[in-house]
Regions:
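Active-site neighborhoods and metal-handling regions in enzymes and metal-associated proteins
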Residues: 2-371
């Protein structure tokens, strides 16, 4: 029996998500925003951007956004879905770029981070002037609509419920892979569409690897166990990490947990609209560096989350991305001791003018799990 977590959005409806976000009115507003940001027709080839703008989920489609026209190019497999979109639909063979260049204007903008070289070469050979863009649609997607925020809140509510159950589970004697399977199946039971990404369960020395793959390692007493796992609802992701203890920890790890938590709380306080990702990262990083552990925090403080698990804005030392109201980001410092273990504490938040709306409710105090 599925034990679904009910989440009510600000509108009062249960489980509002991507489908409501992609009604005709919403799509036209999104397209209008893209049109305002370009000075040449934009060829959209990144699948998630095509999906966000039209509602078409396809592995072989392109979208041309023109000032007064919107065209989807796809093959017969996706025609029925494409015809439901608020756009003209043009059927072309599966080899999209064998036919597409002859149907395009002589000058277009394109998504430089998703268009492969062979496809660009086909455009060039057809004499089409190409103008590269970087993260244009992604920058617009970074500010979430109410329905998108509700879907992310729902995914976070399921993640929180899973963590409550996880804290009651035995860890010692189980493998990382067993616990990862339990996490994913529990999120399904709670009503998730699926996991936002393959769950990370990293025990002992594996915890020093930020993106460790759970394997056959058996969890032992006196270790940290880094659990990075979250739910997905209606195409929108959550994200969360908590670090558990399986008994008294070595002093080095116990101190690192306290420092990581202090840095995480400072980063949360700094996560406000109008600040750059670099500046927010620096606030948390300074706390960890002053404690003498800065070299062990080797990744950025956080990233945007939405239809993708990693989106704009980035919060890392070199990032000039500016945080905006209704953006969704992680705040996740980590301290990693090679050969010993790791600590990471991650919350998902909605950016506000002042304090962020924190979606992760599971405690950040160090939880010692049983057996």
């Amino acid at each position: 029996m599925r034990d679904e977590v009910e989440h009510k959005g600000e509108s009062g409806a249960v489980g509002i998500g991507a489908r409501r976000c992609r009604d005709a009115e919403g799509v036209s507003e999104r397209v209008t925003k893209v049109r305002a940001a370009i000075d040449a027709p934009l060829l959209v080839t990144k699948p998630v951007n095509v999906l966000w703008l039209t509602g078409l989920d396809s592995s072989n489609a392109a979208l041309l956004v023109e000032p007064d026209r919107l065209r989807i190019f796809t093959d017969f497999r996706y025609l029925e879905k494409a015809l439901a979109a608020e756009a003209e639909v043009v059927e072309i063979p599966r080899g999209l770029f064998s036919k597409l260049p002859e149907l395009l204007p002589k000058r277009i903008a394109f998504e430089s981070e998703s268009l492969v070289h062979a496809s660009w070469a086909a455009l060039d050979a057809a004499g089409i002037e190409t103008v590269p863009t970087a993260q244009l649609v992604e920058g617009i997607r970074a500010v979430k609509e109410p329905g998108e925020l509700d879907a992310i809140r729902h995914a976070s509510a399921i993640t929180n419920a899973m963590l409550d159950r996880l804290a009651e589970q035995p860890f010692v004697g189980r493998t990382e892979a067993e616990l990862a399977w339990w996490i994913e199946s529990t999120m399904h039971e709670l009503g998730a569409e699926g996991a936002a990404f393959p769950p990370i369960v990293a025990a002992g020395p594996n915890g020093a690897l930020p993106h460790a793959n759970p394997g056959a390692r058996t969890i032992e007493k006196g270790q940290t166990v880094v659990v990075d796992a979250a739910a997905k609802v209606d195409g929108y992701h959550s994200d969360c990490t908590r670090t558990f203890a399986t008994g008294p920890l070595p002093d080095e790890l116990a101190r690192s947990y306290a420092v990581c938590l202090e840095g995480q709380l400072a980063g949360l306080e700094a996560t406000r609209a109008g600040r750059s990702g670099r500046d927010v990262d620096a606030v948390a990083r300074d706390v960890i560096t002053r404690a003498g552990l800065g070299e062990l925090f080797a990744h950025g403080l956080g990233h945007g989350v939405g239809m993708e698990i990693h989106e704009q804005p980035a919060m890392r030392p070199e990032s000039e991305d500016v945080l905006a109201v209704d953006g969704v980001v992680t705040v996740e410092p980590g301290i990693y001791h090679p050969g010993l273990g790791g600590i990471r504490i991650e919350d998902l938040v909605i950016i506000r003018e002042n304090e962020p709306e924190v979606l992760t409710t599971f405690t950040k105090e160090l939880v010692t799990v049983g057996r």
